[in-house]
Swiss-Prot record:
Subcellular localization, as worded in the UniProt entry: Lysosome membrane; Late endosome membrane
Region described as Important for arginine binding and amino acid transport: 128-133
A Pfam family per the record: Aa_trans
Side Cytoplasmic, residues: 1-118, 167-197, 299-307, 376-392, 457-477, 527-538
Protein name (Swiss-Prot/TrEMBL): Neutral amino acid transporter 9
Protein modification: Glycosylated.
Membrane-related topology note: Multi-pass membrane protein
GO MF term set: active monoatomic ion transmembrane transporter activity; amino acid transmembrane transporter activity; arginine binding; cholesterol binding; guanyl-nucleotide exchange factor activity; inorganic cation transmembrane transporter activity; L-amino acid transmembrane transporter activity; L-arginine transmembrane transporter activity
Similarity comment: family membership: Belongs to the amino acid/polyamine transporter 2 family. SLC38A9 subfamily.
UniProt organism field: Rattus norvegicus (Rat)
Length: 559
């Protein structure tokens, strides 16, 4: 009788502080599909919430108790006794078993597990790669030369695509373990041990923190220009009178005046206007505005969950599409201004081949960087056999987008009267603060970056604190210290080195050295060697890729 009484108890214990209660108090989290497997019941025993509850069969109840018993033999983190994939029904046939003897089909489960079509997968990859690097592509083409720049963009796209292909195929080359749920750091750990795990973590943090620094510099820039636009509009000030610029309906300015360094001053001096002097004192691009952002963004970084900010991801796509629109419109208005000189520079034009082309390769390494999360993106592809095809199409679209933006901005830059060397590391800086189209672009990008910045901070927290303490939120003190370090780095760079092109190329070459060039090539060499299929051409080709990655990083320090 004791056994009968124990069998009649509820199989799912009560949980307090329930966040998302399901029907009949069922606890369900669709984000962890493997550790919380639903129990399958024949369709004859399935009911809706509003239907009369029908008891399940004795066989189904006994099977549920058996699985419940097995789950108690190990800790929840141990996957040893979880039912394997081949015995689990399809997602649309999975149901959650209630202790009251009924089964419910939860929409959140099937929706959370739904696969993406190839079109959605391609768009996701394109959208993920479209970041701040797009603002520096025209500057990179100027540094490399027009012809060389276009060739470098295409070649870097092909090289990073191949390395990304090797990342996608890396799991399938491991036959001794079940790699279904593995991410790329797990593959690195398999081949290189703890060194591979921690080194991949280090380089991933480099890319994240580098991106956050670039975001802080750009947000300071956009916030400064936004405030300057409003002030100039109210006081009827024309800011193109004090810098080298074109005199037409679509003005273009040269804030660095050929010095190669961005203008860090706020605005012009008006000796007779105390109000303007006061505004300039408290609204300076490098001395005050970066500190104003601390009050806006530091509290957002301390949120436990970034789910609210993830709702604004669509703004990234809108911003890129608007940049394409504004570049197209400006090119139509300005026309093309090109002259071809292969090696010798002229007063207004740069040569087609320049020794500074590694600066563009550094920028492009980050611009094409998706290698640390490509496995995750492709996991949800409905047709896994199309992964390689979809990846190639996405890379082609990204390459065409970079070429379109870079070529149009460079070719339409009005030379003369302005030299091509005036193209800024952020090409929006070549448009005056009073330009309405640029003002809208800066507003959109500023808001979009303010929503993405907490997400990047959350990812950095997950990777660093999660690995060190085993908890992504050990305490408010730990989180605050980490966020202060990240914010401090951003403020420091915005004040003393506000060159987004330089920051992008250094961080891109550093993180790309591991994730793009070394790890994919070494893993392929080791796997082929273990299978005794390694040939000299394969070995030499992948060693050349590693050498190119090292040369790319070293060259950044000599440019």
């Amino acid at each position: 009788m004791a056994n009968v009484d124990s069998d009649s108890r509820h199989l799912i214990s009560e949980v307090e502080h329930e966040v998302n209660p399901g029907p009949m108090n069922i606890q369900f989290d669709s984000s962890d599909l493997r550790s919380k497997r639903p129990f399958y019941i024949e369709p004859t025993n399935i009911v809706n919430v509003n239907d009369v509850i029908q008891k399940v069969s004795d066989h189904a109840a006994a099977m549920n108790k058996r699985i419940h018993y097995y789950s108690r033999l190990t800790t929840p983190a141990d996957k040893a006794l979880i039912a394997p994939d081949h015995v689990v029904p399809a997602p649309e046939e999975c149901y959650v078993y209630s202790p009251l003897g009924s089964a419910y089909k939860l929409k959140s489960y099937t929706e959370g597990y739904r696969k993406n079509t190839s079109l959605v997968t391609i768009f996701m990859i394109w959208n993920t790669m479209m970041g701040t690097s797009i603002l520096s592509i025209p500057w990179g083409i100027k540094q490399a030369g027009f012809t060389t720049g276009m060739c470098v963009i295409v070649l870097m796209g092909l090289l990073t695509l191949y390395c990304c292909y090797r990342v996608v195929k890396s799991r399938s080359m491991i036959v001794t373990s079940d790699t279904t749920t593995w991410e790329y750091p797990d593959v690195c750990k398999h081949y290189f041990g703890s060194f591979g795990q921690w080194s991949s973590l280090l380089f991933s943090l480099v890319s994240l923190i580098g991106a956050m620094i670039v975001y802080w510099v750009l947000m300071s820039n956009f916030l400064f220009n936004t405030g300057k636009f409003i002030f100039n509009f109210i006081h009827h000030i024309n800011d193109t009178d004090t810098v080298l610029s074109t005199n037409n309906s679509s003005p273009v300015i040269c804030p660095s005046a050929g010095s190669g360094h961005p203008d860090n001053s706020s605005m012009i001096f008006y000796n007779s206007d105390t109000e303007v002097r006061l505004f300039e004192r408290w609204w300076d691009k490098s001395k005050t505005v970066p500190f104003y952002l601390i009050g806006l963004l530091l509290p957002l970084l301390n949120f436990k969950s970034p789910s609210f900010f993830s709702k604004f991801n669509i703004l990234g796509t809108v911003s890129v599409l608007y940049l394409i629109f504004i570049v197209t419109l400006k090119a139509i208005r300005l026309g093309f201004h090109l002259e071809f000189h292969w090696f010798a520079p002229t007063e207004f034009f740069v040569p087609e081949i320049r020794a500074q082309f590694p600066q563009l390769t550094g920028v492009l390494t980050l611009a094409f960087f998706i290698h640390n999360c490509i496995i995750t993106l492709l996991k949800n592809n409905k047709n896994q056999e199309n992964n390689v095809r979809d990846l190639c199409i996405a890379y082609m679209l990204v390459t065409l987008t970079y070429l379109y933006i870079g070529v149009l901005v460079f070719a339409s830059f009005p030379s003369p009267p302005l030299p091509k060397d005036c193209i800024e590391q952020n090409f929006l800086d070549n448009f005056p603060s009073s330009d309405t189209l640029s003002f809208i672009a800066r507003i959109c990008l500023l808001f979009q970056m303010m929503t993405v910045y907490p997400l990047l901070g959350y990812l950095a927290r997950v990777q660093l604190l999660g690995h060190i303490f085993g908890d992504i939120y050990p305490s408010i003190f730990h989180v605050l210290i980490l966020n202060l370090i990240i914010v401090g780095a951003g403020v420091t760079m915005a004040c003393f080195y506000p060159n987004i092109g330089g920051i992008i190329r250094y961080s891109g070459a550093a993180c790309g050295l591991a994730f793009v060039f070394i790890y994919p090539s070494l893993i392929y060499i080791l796997s082929q060697h273990q299978e005794e299929r390694l040939t000299w051409p394969k070995l030499v080709f992948h060693i050349i890729i590693i050498i190119l990655g090292l040369a790319n990083l070293i060259a950044q320090f000599f440019m």
